[in-house]
């Protein structure tokens, strides 16, 4: 009897010690979380309420024709840090956090994922630009931001004067042409769409290396690696595999009206698996583009080259 009591006491105390250690690590991690980075030089930060009931965080700077920059996953507007200030020398640049990312709202997903549809996310950004007085503007979107940008050109054709899509082909094309090579290149497209919590658990792997993270990675993790951030990213992908496909199927006969420039990683999966220009020329009337150095996140990997391409296209 004494041995049994002693064993129970030991187990109880061990449990308390483990719980205390976990809580201590959680508190330490929270205390060690980096503060938000300041806006780019010459930019100001804004938090803009939208018609969709969320608040979108954005930075704005420069002067000239308006230009909206949209990031991918799991990044934030900070991904444009080496490009936006230089574009601001000739454009009024707005770099925004998408719904669910960075310092924008991270709402709980609805059962049909509609509040993370690209339609809802595009409307957020239309509201942001209108809040600054811009009814028409040029648009650059990379990765998930490119998918929001694609939907924006269809839902708001009069608002977008020119569009640049970076390292994507249309979502509908990808999901209707699934191959083993696609699954191997983009496993997260299938992992993150799994019901909670499986998808959210998979999202942990997208946060970058645990050891010696860069300042940019720390900034992306600050909000995107929280439980709410991981859920939001999964909802973005769940919407892409459900309600976004419904919207895209309804618009298969429509073409993007504005000029489109497509940039993709010359050494990446898009170049290896797809005829990127041919696919986009089925979806838009006026398409140019080329393979680029710098990888999938070329705005970080080759900012000078990306800047030159954006300037050439947007100035014309």
Q: What is the predicted function of each stretch?
A:
Residues 32-45, 54-56, 63-66, 94, ...:
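Flexible "cap/lid" subdomain of the alpha/beta-hydrolase fold that forms the substrate-access gate
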Residues 72, 301-302:
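Active-site helix-initiating loop/hinge in glycosyltransferases
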Residues 60-106:
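Conserved HGGG/HGGXW glycine-rich cap/lid loop of the alpha/beta-hydrolase fold
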Residues 2-18:
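N-terminal secretory signal peptides and thylakoid transit peptides that target proteins
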Residues 14, 125, 306, 310:
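Hydrophobic "lid"/C-terminal helical patch
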Residues 13-46:
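An N-terminal hydrophobic leader/cap segment in hydrolases
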Residues 82-85, 89, 154-155, 308, ...:
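Short, well-ordered alpha-helices that flank and scaffold nucleotide-derived cofactor binding pockets
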Residues 50-51:
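Structural motif
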């Amino acid at each position: 009897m004494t041995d049994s009591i002693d064993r129970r006491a030991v187990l109880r105390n061990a449990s308390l010690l483990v719980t205390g250690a976990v809580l201590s690590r959680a508190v330490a991690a929270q205390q060690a979380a980096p503060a938000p980075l300041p806006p780019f030089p010459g930019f100001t930060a804004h938090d803009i309420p939208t018609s969709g009931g969320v608040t979108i965080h954005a930075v704005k700077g420069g002067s000239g024709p308006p230009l909206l920059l949209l990031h991918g996953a799991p990044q934030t507007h900070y991904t444009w840090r080496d490009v936006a200030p230089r574009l601001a020398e000739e454009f009024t640049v707005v770099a925004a956090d998408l719904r669910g990312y960075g310092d924008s709202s991270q709402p709980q997903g609805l059962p049909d994922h509609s509040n993370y549809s690209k339609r809802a996310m595009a409307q957020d950004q239309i509201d942001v630009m209108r809040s600054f007085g811009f009814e028409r503007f040029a648009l650059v979107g990379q990765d998930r931001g490119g998918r929001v940008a694609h939907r924006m050109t269809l839902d708001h054709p009069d608002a977008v004067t020119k569009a640049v899509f970076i390292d994507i082909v249309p979502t509908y094309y990808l999901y209707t042409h699934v191959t083993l090579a696609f699954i191997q290149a983009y496993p997260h497209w299938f992992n993150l769409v799994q019901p909670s919590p499986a998808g959210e658990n998979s999202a942990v792997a997208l946060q970058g290396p645990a050891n010696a993270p860069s300042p940019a990675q720390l900034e992306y993790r600050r909000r995107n690696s929280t439980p709410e951030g991981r859920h939001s990213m999964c909802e973005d992908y769940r919407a892409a595999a459900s309600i976004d496909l419904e919207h895209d199927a309804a618009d298969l006969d429509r073409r993007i009206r504005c000029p489109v420039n497509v940039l993709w990683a010359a050494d990446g999966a898009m170049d290896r698996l797809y005829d990127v220009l041919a696919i986009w020329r089925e979806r838009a009337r006026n398409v140019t583009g080329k393979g680029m150095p710098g990888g999938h996140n070329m705005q970080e990997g080759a900012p000078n080259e990306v800047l030159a391409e954006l300037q050439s296209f947007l100035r014309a």
